[in-house]
Amino acid sequence: MGGYVHDVEIEGGHTIVVDEPAFVEGGTDAGPSPTRLVAAGLAGCTAVTMEMYAARRGWDVGAVEVDVDVEYEDFAPLSFAVTLRLPAGLSEEQRQRLLAVAAKCPVHRLLAGETEVVISDRIEDLPDA
């Protein structure tokens, strides 16, 4: 693969193509950028966390939607703004509980600095092609 295109293997046998947008020198837009993948992970994790919470309480919430907008400065992400879309028929108490639960999803906690990220000091050689 050329430029910044990478096949990223994920647990479970999934592969995602990662790249930078075409407006970034060397980027070809062959896949989402790593930052966009983080935003997608935050959206998915938030939705699933809220749905699991609602299911455990027997609430029929149907589908929820989560949008994540990334604010950048010089290509570096400054913030992730999360918008929740919930069914109109929920009570105010249910809505407030789901809002509180949304901030407890594992990806949100990781981004908020509640999870340790360790870069190993071990470097391995790539196998010969």
What are the functions of these language-model segments?
Residues M1-A40, M50-A129:
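Extended beta-strand/beta-hairpin segments
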Residues C45-T46:
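Alpha-helical metal-binding/catalytic segments enriched in His/Glu/Asp
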